[in-house]
Curated annotation (Swiss-Prot):
The lineage of its organism: Bacteria, Bacillati, Actinomycetota, Actinomycetes, Mycobacteriales. GO terms for molecular function: adenosylcobinamide-GDP ribazoletransferase activity; cobalamin 5'-phosphate synthase activity. It catalyses: alpha-ribazole + adenosylcob(III)inamide-GDP = adenosylcob(III)alamin + GMP + H(+); alpha-ribazole 5'-phosphate + adenosylcob(III)inamide-GDP = adenosylcob(III)alamin 5'-phosphate + GMP + H(+). Keywords: Cell membrane, Cobalamin biosynthesis, Magnesium, Membrane, Transferase, Transmembrane, Transmembrane helix. Joins adenosylcobinamide-GDP and alpha-ribazole to generate adenosylcobalamin (Ado-cobalamin). Also synthesizes adenosylcobalamin 5'-phosphate from adenosylcobinamide-GDP and alpha-ribazole 5'-phosphate. The chain crosses the membrane at residues 35-55, 59-79, 110-130, 134-154, 175-195, 199-219, 229-249. It is a multi-pass membrane protein. The keyword Isomerase does not apply. This is Adenosylcobinamide-GDP ribazoletransferase. Its main location: membrane. GO terms for biological process: cobalamin biosynthetic process. The gene is cobS. Pathway: Cofactor biosynthesis; adenosylcobalamin biosynthesis; adenosylcobalamin from cob(II)yrinate a,c-diamide: step 7/7. Signal peptide: none annotated.
Length: 251
């Protein structure tokens, strides 16, 4: 278990993990990925809270700095998946052509637009959540939800896209019990994410639902999931969860 956790941190962050303490990315590391999400969520919440203290609760700078911190500590790994997946979905060719577009090193207009929307939506939502609560638990819950979405995307019935090395190692690797357990933990944490107990669960379920729709569409479009699809699902789920929660706390 510790080896899988170390592998998950080595994969999902820039934190130095000794080579001897980690293994290849696979089933165990994917199961442990939400733990990485908890750590990243705590970091983002702390930065957003600090930004609200320094710049004022009405300033969006705290949320923007929180997103920047996440991009730095994850090497932009998942946001790159957003760009590649958007470009692939924007291609009107057959699945093999769409997969080739995703593997291309350049970023097209769909990818650029998707990244801008995700970054700005997360930044503004994080700022709103930090302004509305003494401790922005909602920020941490949204980031955590994104990593839970990755586990759901790798459940037993989901295939890997042809030519995807990461997809081949993690697609279909997660039993339903593991996915259900992480969803239960997420829902439990989300109970304290908003002023009312139902705010958090509604927001994260909406986020997970949107992430699930994206994964299903990508399976139809690309023939399965890849590392880029997982990254896009993570970011979409986190974004929708944060935006929905920011809207609900004002109800």
């Amino acid at each position: 278990m510790m080896r899988s956790l170390a592998t998950a941190f080595a994969f999902g962050t820039v934190l130095p993990v000794p080579a001897g303490g980690r293994g290849p990315m696979g089933r165990g590391a994917m199961t442990a990925l939400p733990v990485v999400g908890l750590a990243l969520g705590a970091l983002a919440a702390a930065v957003a809270w600090g930004g609200a203290v320094v710049f004022g609760r009405s300033s969006p700078l705290g949320g923007l700095l929180a997103v920047a911190a996440l991009l730095l500590i994850t090497r932009g790994l998942h946001i790159d998946g957003v760009a590649d997946t958007a470009d692939g979905l924007g291609c009107y060719g057959p699945p093999d052509r769409a997969r080739a577009v995703m593997r291309d090193g350049s970023t097209g207009p769909f990818g650029v637009a998707a990244v801008v929307v995700v970054v700005m939506a997360q930044a503004l939502a994080f700022s709103a959540l930090a302004a509305g609560r003494p401790v922005p638990v909602g920020v941490a819950v949204a980031v955590f939800a994104g990593r839970v979405a990755a586990v759901l995307a790798c459940r037993r019935t989901v295939p890997a896209a042809a030519g995807s090395s990461l997809g081949a190692t993690v697609a279909g690797s997660q039993p339903a019990t593991v996915a259900a357990a992480w969803v239960a933990v997420l829902l439990g944490m989300s109970l304290v994410a908003g002023p009312r107990p139902w705010h958090g669960p509604v927001a994260v379920l909406l986020g997970l639902g949107c992430g699930g729709v994206l994964v299903r569409h990508c399976v139809r479009r690309f023939g399965g999931i890849s590392g880029d699809v997982l990254g896009a699902a993570i970011e979409l789920t986190a974004t929708v969860s944060a935006v929905a929660l920011a809207a609900l706390v004002r109800v």
